[in-house]
């Protein structure tokens, strides 16, 4: 069955949270403590938090569905006020569905959403050790633009900032 990307709804929060809990650890460097990963998932990727994300008018949660179940998701956040940028805050696909086209479908839908909402630029942060994600983002037109730090539990991770003009 083909992969469909939809705008997620409130009733998807629990399933999105389950996908997030299964996929977020895969993007973390091996040096990150399991307790820090678990704390991040509990604080930022719970069903309740997804409910908050889904209710936020400045965010969209896109869900990739296959055979009626969510296999991946992306969260995009509009910039404040006159800021014409959109952040691709999160984008993950279940490992069993890597290379299925789900990530590319989510990216196309995310780019279209950002463009449709007046953004001139899409940006994201990606861990400096996550070569696979960096290759994927470059393939979709993103370029390195700088660095940032990302707080993960008791540690701080170094991210590259990548941008894509729309």
Tell what function each PLM region has.
Residues 3, 7-13, 17-98, 104-113, ...:
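Acetyl-CoA-dependent GNAT
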Residues 9-11, 86, 120-134, 138-166:
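C-terminal "cap" of GNAT-fold acetyltransferases
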């Amino acid at each position: 069955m083909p992969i469909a990307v939809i705008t997620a709804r409130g009733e998807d929060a629990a399933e999105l949270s389950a996908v997030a809990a299964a996929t977020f650890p895969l993007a973390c460097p091996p040096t990150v403590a399991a307790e820090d990963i678990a704390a991040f998932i509990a604080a930022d990727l719970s069903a309740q938090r997804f409910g908050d994300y889904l209710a936020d008018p400045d965010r969209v949660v896109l869900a990739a569905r296959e055979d009626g179940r969510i296999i991946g998701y992306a969260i995009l956040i509009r910039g404040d006020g006159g800021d014409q940028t959109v952040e691709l805050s999160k984008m993950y696909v279940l490992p069993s569905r890597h290379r299925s086209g789900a990530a590319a479908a989510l990216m196309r839908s995310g780019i279209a959403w950002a463009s449709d909402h007046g953004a001139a630029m899409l940006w994201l942060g990606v861990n400096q050790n996550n070569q696979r994600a960096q290759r994927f983002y470059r393939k979709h037109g993103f370029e390195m633009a700088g660095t940032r730090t990302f707080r993960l539990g008791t540690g701080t991770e170094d991210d590259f900032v990548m941008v894509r003009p729309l």
